[in-house]
Structures are given as C-alpha cells and as structure tokens.
C-alpha cells in the first residue's frame, strides 16, 4: 500500500472554458494546481508504480483538509488527482480503479491532501 500526505490545497477538476473566438483553456487556478501536483508527487512516482505493477484492480482513496470551508465536490477533486497521474504515465489507466474512498475535513487550519493507493488484484 502506498500512502502519503502532501501540503497542497486541493483544487477540483474544472471544465475547459470556451471563448467565443480562440481555443478552449482551463482556468489558471486549476492549471497551476495540476503543475504543482505533478511536481510534488514526482519523487514518489516509482513507489506508486511499484504498487500498481501487474495489477488488474486497485483502490485509490484520498482525504483532504481545507483551511476554510471548501465548496468543492469530492468527485471533482478525485478526478483532478487521478487525471494528472494518468497523464504523467504514473497510473496506467484509471479505469482499473474499483474502489474509491474520499473524505474532506473543513476548517482544519491548513491545506493538505493524503492519497492511498492499494493493490486489490
């Protein structure tokens, strides 16, 4: 099982904005979170990949703590975390996730995300 806590503020996945003229783009807040999430998790990629090696099913669970009351949906935060690890090639395919557990803590006084990845089969 892989488990680690990261000191970063959780940002939910957002839909791309589509201007009348030009190309679709993601909001700056979400784009910056995606970059930062990959930066801080990069040293742990070998451990995550080792946990997922030769597996058909796994659990991806997380908890996040908010300094204030967050309005973000749990499923959108999970999507943001999973999608970036898939894009980086750390997680081969997020359709192998068969169990997801999520929990958020309000008014904790600090921002953090803790992820758990466990091989099932």
Task: Go through the PLM ranges and name each one.
Residues 1-121:
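Acidic, proline/glycine-enriched N-terminal capping motif
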């Amino acid at each position: 099982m892989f488990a680690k806590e990261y000191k970063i503020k959780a940002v939910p996945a957002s839909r791309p904005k589509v201007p009348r003229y030009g190309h679709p783009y993601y909001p700056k807040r979400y784009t910056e979170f995606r970059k930062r999430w990959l930066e801080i998790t990069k040293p742990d990629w070998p451990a995550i990949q080792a946990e997922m090696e030769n597996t058909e099913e796994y659990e991806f669970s997380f908890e996040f703590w908010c300094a204030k009351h967050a309005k973000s949906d749990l499923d959108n935060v999970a999507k943001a975390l999973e999608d970036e690890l898939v894009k980086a090639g750390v997680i081969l395919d997020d359709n192998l996730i068969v169990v997801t557990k999520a929990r958020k803590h309000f008014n904790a006084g600090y921002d953090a995300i803790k992820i758990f990845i466990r091989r099932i089969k």
